[in-house]
Amino acid sequence: MSDNPSSRAGPEVVPTPPPSPAAEAAVTALPAHGHRPPATGSALAKLALGALGVVYGDIGTSPLYALKECFTGHHGVQATPANVLGVLSLVFWAMTFVVTFKYLSFVMRADNRGEGGILALLALVGKHEVRRSGKQLLIILGLFGAALLYGDGVITPAISVLGAVEGLSVAAPALEHWVVPVTVGILALLFFIQRRGTAAVGAVFGPVMLVWFLCIAILGVRGILFDATILQAVLPTHAVAFFARNSWHGFLVLGGVVLVITGGEALYADMGHFGKRPIRFAWLLVAMPALMLNYMGQGAILLHDPQAARNPFYLLVPGWALYPMIAVATAAAIVASQALISGAFSLTRQAVQLGYSPRVTIRHTSSTEIGQIYVPEVNALLGAATIALVLGFKSSSNLAAAYGIAVTGTMAITTLLFHRVARDLWRWPRWRAWPLTLLFLLVDLAFFGANIVKVEEGGWFPLAAAAFVFTLLSTWKRGREGLADLMRGAGLPLDVFLEDIARRKPQRVPGTAVFMTGNTGTVPPVLLHHLKHNKVLHERVVLTSIMSEEIPSVRDAERVTVKELGSGFIQVIARYGFMETPDVPAMFASLPHRKLDGPRIELKPMETTYYLGRETLLPTGPSKMARWRKRLFIIMSRNAQTASAFFGLPPNRVVEMGAQLQL
């Protein structure tokens, strides 16, 4: 119901205030979402198995296409014995340095109350950067890194499933024309079933990936038996000799080598789900040994037969096992794709809660796992873009050119944010922080440089996708800040309003009115409009603010603050982390059972009315945003999920009142 029919066309604005000071202390306070007691024994094994299914799907399916790209890609080298040993040496040391040394040993230590990922890292370091210019640079870098991850979420399902299904052309060349249609069918089904959630099949992800890793390890051992001299590739001298021999061409091959470490960022992003120890355990005990055995096996096949470079993975498989292996590879590719899709959903929720994205529909698909969510808007965009990529690029080799830029760009940005954590939070001296940062950047930028030359061959896609997403995220952030400043400047101080109410004593009616507001120090405009037009107030007025904290989750004991304001007014402040979804009715229902310092509140649903403001925005105000950005912000606002739906308010108990605002 609405008191202003014209308001239906405009966006609702419930301003998101800056994170409260509580976020400062919470970063180093007691553990919440991500921190857990160190897992041991069977618990460690179960978490490690789960990590195999979620964390290592992307990097685990890289053998399908990575080595092939190094020798047959746009910048591939001839599969001579010296080049094979050189490339395999680069593969071994890339995995060892980037994944084991950089991410597992250092980056995973930079957690936001146990949560990892680039937005969690941005939230952590942003509040500790005192210089405005430095903070703006961090935000730009973090947002662009997050934008690149969306591109990764589109490319990974496409290249993984394509790489798996391409085994058909090895098993039966006559089936080659079926590769793209089968891939499109699998991807369409995968995105279609997202709405039902993955709880039913999620339990098999870990076992599927364990079977996959065992299979590729066995295949690798089989290949090594052809020519065990491939094991010499662990010597770094072969990598050095490779660069000396191939010079610039050798540098460009890094664009293919980087494919063996795609998914490295997932180790960090999924840290909050499994913990550091299970992720490290799964990598060192299962994933890395299996991957290295398989890459060495592919290298041995290439030493034995250089013509195998056209598809060294499937040519490592004996003829009788080709079709079963295609099935296992496809299952593994689906698991890898699911992990990236779920990651995009989670990233979107973080962006919404941190104020970088409009409200979107977030549906929980599991009654037991809070992290299992479905975001229809993101699913539709990812699905359409992924299928379009398959139809446009048609092969994993063509897609490989597009893949590396998103991955290496994100890795370089993570390194820069890690440096701020080391300097500002850990108080590392310059002599300790800078050498490590420069070493990480040297490797990251080498990989990025080798990929940036592939812009015309497909690298344009992740850059274009990232630029598009970055524009949306940054526009929304700037628009929300400008809108909050506008409303804060025009707002009536709450204490002045309460003094006026105590003096004028307006007529009161039975029941409770809940007014949603983003600013705890001023009166919600919708309350002023209500009092001006209706001339009455409810017996009890609850001013409710939902605060988004820059931490993954808020401890239950710190969730709600209640304060008696006098004259029948009560202020309720509820805090949520960026991994949580606010539910206002559930929050109110929990109040009678909480130990609070303020007054006891018990709302009767049928006697409670929720009041929301719905503002029509015009791009003609004093904001310093460019006019095109204002128009884009207004379009995004109009298409955002309604505040009543996002906060879980009962539709038949909501009153919306509208006004015009010039941005």
From Swiss-Prot:
Residues 1-23 are annotated as: Disordered. The chain crosses the membrane at residues 81-101, 137-157, 173-193, 201-221, 224-244, 248-268, 283-303, 315-335, 373-393, 399-419, 433-453, 455-475. It is found in: Cell inner membrane. The keyword Metal-binding does not apply. Keywords: Cell inner membrane, Cell membrane, Ion transport, Membrane, Potassium, Potassium transport, Symport, Transmembrane, Transmembrane helix, Transport. The keyword Zinc-finger does not apply. One of its GO terms (molecular function) is symporter activity. InterPro entries: K+_transporter (IPR003855), K_trans_C (IPR053952), K_trans_N (IPR053951), Kup (IPR023051). Disulfide bonds: none annotated. It catalyses: K(+)(in) + H(+)(in) = K(+)(out) + H(+)(out). It is a multi-pass membrane protein. GO terms for cellular component: plasma membrane. Belongs to the HAK/KUP transporter (TC 2.A.72) family. Transport of potassium into the cell. Likely operates as a K(+):H(+) symporter. This is Probable potassium transport system protein Kup. It comes from Anaeromyxobacter sp. (strain Fw109-5).
